[in-house]
Swiss-Prot record:
Signal peptide start and end residues: 1-18
Segments of this protein annotated with the region 3 X approximate tandem repeats: 32-63
PANTHER family according to UniProt: APOLIPOPROTEIN (PTHR18976), APOLIPOPROTEIN A-I (PTHR18976:SF11)
Record function comment: Participates in the reverse transport of cholesterol from tissues to the liver for excretion by promoting cholesterol efflux from tissues and by acting as a cofactor for the lecithin cholesterol acyltransferase (LCAT).
Organism phylogeny: Eukaryota, Metazoa, Chordata, Craniata, Vertebrata
Protein's name in the database: Apolipoprotein A-I
Sequence repeat segments: 64-85, 87-107, 108-118, 119-140, 141-162, 163-184, 185-206, 207-225, 226-236, 237-260
Expression tissues: Strong expression in liver with lower expression in intestine.
Length: 260
């Protein structure tokens, strides 16, 4: 499978890549192994997710066997990686020892090359800066011309819009006043109707309210001269009568509201 072939190739690459590492390569080699572990885990998880996409019942046994096979291959690769690691370390140490002089000489050559290229690097920097200045000189007039025209167009648009906006404000104010003129009679009509209805209700309810107030005053006056038991005996019939009259008031109000 591609999974196994790719994993084995990466596994061997970690060992062979050790020959090109610098003096701090042991940590780099460990890092490469850690990256390989993460990659192998990701490939395994992706493969299992792909297998789990087979939802049809006829694939159930095949899906189980394939998932088990992927887990076994992952375990085998990890085992092989563990057995290869000592050989990789030994090979790396040998290569680093054998190539020590060559690497040191190469570092010296690289530093010398870097020093010799410094003047050319500065010259290259100056050439690039000159080219950028040429481009800037060429493009600046075009940009300035565009900006000037754009500013002029915006100013012209603003000039054209000013009278339109003033006319629009005037029309809006006139429309508001016109709407108010049409709306106010409607509001007054509603207010008059509500006032009339409330006045009618007040006239209907007023006799009952007055009678209720007189009865309450009578009960209060009697409460000042009789004992509690006698007061309770006298109040009970009045309370019942008040309940009946209050119910009548509510019925009148409800009927009046319904008619409106």
């Amino acid at each position: 499978m591609k999974f196994a072939a790719l994993a084995l190739a990466l596994l061997l690459a970690v060992g062979s890549h050790a020959a090109s590492m610098q003096a701090d390569a042991p940590s780099q080699l460990d890092h490469a192994r850690a990256v390989l572990d993460v990659y192998l885990t990701q490939v395994k998880d992706m493969s299992l997710r792909a297998v789990n996409q087979l939802d049809d019942p006829q694939y159930a046994e095949f899906k189980t066997n394939l998932a088990q096979r992927i887990e076994e291959m992952y375990t085998q690769i990890k085992t092989l990686q563990g057995s290869v690691s000592p050989m990789t370390d030994s090979f790396y140490n040998t290569v680093m020892e054998v190539t020590k002089d060559t690497r040191e000489s190469l570092n010296v050559d690289l530093e010398a090359l870097k020093s010799s290229l410094a003047p050319q690097n500065e010259q290259l920097k100056q050439v690039i800066e000159k080219h950028l200045n040429d481009y800037r000189t060429l493009l600046t007039p075009i940009y300035n011309d565009y900006k000037t025209k754009h500013d002029e167009e915006m100013a012209a648009l603003k000039t054209r819009l000013e009278p339109v906006m003033e006319e629009l404000r005037t029309k809006i104010q006139a429309n508001v006043e016109e709407t108010k003129a049409v709306l106010m009679p409607m509001v007054e009509t509603v207010r008059t109707k509500v006032t009339e209805r409330l006045e009618s209700l007040r006239e209907v309810v007023q006799p009952y309210v007055q009678e209720y107030k007189e009865q309450m005053k009578q009960m209060y006056d009697q409460a000042q001269t009789v004992d509690t038991d006698a007061l309770r005996t006298k109040i009970t019939p009045l309370v019942e009568e008040i309940k009946v009259k209050m119910n009548a008031i509510f019925e009148i109000i409800a009927a009046s509201v319904t008619k409106s």
